[in-house]
Amino acid sequence: MRVMGLDVGSKTVGVAISDPLGFTAQGVEIIKINEEAKEFGFDRLGELVKEYQVDKFVVGLPKNMNNTEGPRVEASKAYGDKIKEIFNLPVDYQDERLTTVQAERMLVEQADVSRDKRKKVIDKLAAQLILQNYLDRMF
């Protein structure tokens, strides 16, 4: 079962995919979107769904530290509802608190990546962490 993890932002969607057995997550790419212009990257997402033969989506939920839900959680859930409708695949949600912070720390401390380069990969790595956390919880 291949699971696709998504880190949904207002300008980008980080994409990760599980291995066929559902044990490990790998970052795939970052899809540029524009919420204000109603451009959500569904065409590119569809190409990736076909390429990787995806069976399920996991969308990160950026809850507040006190476990409350803000406007970004609503946007992520709306994105999840839309991909469920478009691709007719199940969608689960994973708490993503601190995954971007964790991703940034990994890039700085372990890989010594410059700020400009971090901006280009941070969402993909965050999607990978969201998906890996989900896989670890499920299996």
Swiss-Prot record:
Family, per entry: Belongs to the YqgF nuclease family.
GO BP terms: rRNA 5'-end processing
This protein's name: Putative pre-16S rRNA nuclease
Record Pfam families: RuvX
Alphabetical list of SMART domains matching this protein: YqgFc
EC number: 3.1.-.-
Lineage top rank: taxon: Bacteria
Cited HAMAP family: Nuclease_YqgF (MF_00651)
Function according to Swiss-Prot or TrEMBL: Could be a nuclease involved in processing of the 5'-end of pre-16S rRNA.
